């Protein structure tokens, strides 16, 4: 929806701050994932943005894009969302030997580094009032590209998840 997340406001004492927006039900959906090179030299962020709710079809397309861009085995960490357990997603993963799925424990978003990417993105678009979906798309795309191009931000997302217990084996 085109209702902005509000982080902070200001108004003269005794007056309620007002952030005007158009209450429209337009929205965007984003699929994304952090990548780490096998020798952990470089972090990456791959994402796709859709103007509709994401279904298993888009998840499969996203996985196909990952396989096209990344070499070697690809391990995907997923939360327990029902869309990730859809039969189309499971069938696609079984038919592509390079793709391995691992699941986060139930109700553990703090272990998912991608959740911290979404936090960074929401912070970047907070207190803005896009007039339409195209303006929202520009804001989200700029925010995601900023995160994508910053090794320190990507590293911070991974470090935050590790701080909460995400561990991986060498």
Positions of predicted regions on the chain:
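Short glycine/proline- and charge-enriched loop/turn segments
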Residues: 8-15, 98-101, 118-122
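Short, glycine/charged-enriched secondary-structure capping and boundary segments
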Residues: 5-9, 90-93, 116-118
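Conserved catalytic core of Hanks-type protein kinase domains
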Residues: 33, 69, 120
């Amino acid at each position: 929806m085109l209702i902005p997340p509000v982080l902070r406001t200001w108004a003269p004492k005794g007056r309620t701050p007002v952030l005007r927006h158009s209450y429209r039900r337009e929205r965007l959906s984003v699929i994304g994932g952090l990548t780490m090179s096998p020798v952990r030299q470089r972090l990456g962020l791959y994402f796709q943005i859709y103007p509709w709710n994401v279904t298993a079809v888009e998840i499969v397309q996203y996985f196909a894009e990952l396989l096209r861009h990344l070499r070697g085995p690809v391990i995907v960490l997923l939360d327990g969302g029902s869309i990730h357990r859809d039969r189309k997603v499971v069938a696609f993963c079984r038919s592509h030997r390079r793709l391995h799925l691992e699941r986060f424990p139930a109700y553990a978003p703090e272990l998912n580094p991608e959740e911290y990417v979404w936090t960074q993105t929401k912070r970047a678009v907070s207190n803005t009032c896009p007039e339409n979906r195209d303006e929202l798309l520009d804001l989200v795309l700029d925010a995601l590209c900023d995160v994508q191009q910053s090794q320190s931000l990507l590293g911070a997302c991974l470090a935050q998840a590790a701080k909460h217990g995400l561990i991986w084996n060498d």
